[in-house]
Amino acid sequence: MASTARSLRYALAILTTSLVTPSVWAHAHLTHQYPAANAQVTAAPQAITLNFSEGVETGFSGAKITGPKNENIKTLPAKRNEQDQKQLIVPLADSLKPGTYTVDWHVVSVDGHKTKGHYTFSVK
C-alpha cells in the first residue's frame, strides 16, 4: 500500500511539473505592432509600438528603424507602457517621409529570454 501511495505521489509530481514548466520556457513573441507589418499608412507614425506575449525589459530591448535609402532613422530611448509591461514604445525623433521602412526589433523578456525579428511598413 505504501508503495502504491508513493508511486501515485511521484506520478502527480511529474504531471504537475510538466504542466507548469512550459510557461517558464516561453519567449516574448510579437503579437501586434503599429504600424502593422506590410501596412501602408498615410499619416507618419510618431512612434513604433510593439506588443509582446509577455513582459519585456526596457533596458535590453529596442528597435532599429531603417529608411527607404537604407539610412538609420533616429529614435529616442525605448520605453514600456506604464500600464502594460508587454508593450514597448519606440518614439521617432523626426517625422518619417514617404517610403518603405524596416523595423528590426529585439527584446529580452522579464524571464530573461532574448527574441528578435523584423518587419516592414510604408508611409504614403
From Swiss-Prot:
Binding-site residues for Cu cation, renumbered to this chain: H27, H113
The entry's keywords: Copper, Metal-binding, Periplasm, Signal
InterPro entries in UniProt: CopC-like (IPR047685), CopC/D (IPR032694), CopC_dom (IPR007348), Cu-Rt/internalin_Ig-like (IPR014755), Ig_E-set (IPR014756)
GO molecular function, one term: copper ion binding
GO cellular component annotations of the record: outer membrane-bounded periplasmic space
UniProt GO BP: copper ion homeostasis; copper ion transport; response to copper ion
Xref: Pfam families: CopC
Domain of life assignment: Bacteria
Record protein name field: Protein YobA
Organism encoding this protein: Escherichia coli (strain K12)
